[in-house]
Amino acid sequence: MRITGKTFRRRRADSESEEDEQESEEVRLKLEETREVQNLRKRPNGVSAAALLVGEKVQEETTLVDDPFQMATGGMVDMKKLKERGKDKVSEEEDLHLGTSFSAETNRRDEDADMMKYIETELKKRKGIVEQEEQKAKPKNAEDCLYELPENIRVSSAKKTEEMLSNQMLSGIPEVDLGIDAKIKNIISTEDAKARLLAEQQNKKKDSETSFVPTNMAVNYVQHNRFYHEELNAPIRRNKEEPKARPLRVGDTEKPEPERSPPNRKRPANEKATDDYHYEKFKKMNRRY
């Protein structure tokens, strides 16, 4: 009898190597992401002590400007170099113009540059270089003094610079998203404030209205004369009284004739002329107000 062993599935070497490669790639990607996050969290470096000790390197062009005719080295001048130097300056000016316009559009301020400028000015003051520069200034002519403005007329630009600095500092601060909950709370608070204002305005209107002062003065007080005058061309209407019939008696053969009022009849006390009636009506209308 031949004993057969059980067959088990075995992983191939290729599949194991592929899995190892995938795991290594995942680990590498995670490490790169963490490095990028760390680089973003890094604070920018300020002014280093080594840069302050070494100082700025003076370029050759600045030395040429200080001694353009090379009097210290014998007075030999190379005209080709002078022409090339002028061409380079034009290109540098264009580049500088583009850079300044871009920095003005971003509205951000380089704090390190301001710090370096402040340190340089303070060092010059301590060394006494500023006093020498002030002495180098040319004396002004009498005509130049005429164009100068007195101090009381000069407009101080300190306020403008302070406003510019504050705007630049605020533009550099990144905005933080507070979330949806904060926005919803702000909306609810604004709606409540609107409702309060509307309620206050309505209450003020109700308090201002009183029975003594009418709301519409024109309706209550304007009385036009056309309501008091009678129509001129209107036909005159008179109430004609029908004649009263005489009572019949026994033995009367003729028809009873209507009674005629005597010519000089006295009027009762209730009867008045139309002028008196309108006059009394006018007086009553004015008494109401």
Swiss-Prot record:
Compartments where located: Nucleus; Chromosome, Centromere
GO molecular function list: U5 snRNA binding
**Organism domain of life:** Eukaryota
Where the protein is mainly located, per its record?
A: nucleus
Sequence positions bearing Phosphoserine: 15, 17, 261
Q: Where is the composition biased (Basic and acidic residues)?
A: 232-283
The record's Gene Ontology biological-process terms are: chromosome segregation; mRNA cis splicing, via spliceosome; regulation of homologous chromosome segregation
**InterPro entries (UniProt xref):** Tls1-like
* List of residues that carry Phosphothreonine: 253
Where Phosphotyrosine occurs, the residues are 147
Q: Which Pfam families match?
A: Hep_59
Keywords from UniProt, A to Z, are:
Centromere, Chromosome, Chromosome partition, mRNA processing, mRNA splicing, Nucleus, Phosphoprotein, RNA-binding, Spliceosome
According to the record's subunit comment, the protein's assembly and interactions are:
Component of the spliceosome. Interacts with SNRNP200; the interaction is direct. Interacts with PRPF8.
Task: Tell me the protein's name.
Answer: Splicing factor C9orf78 homolog
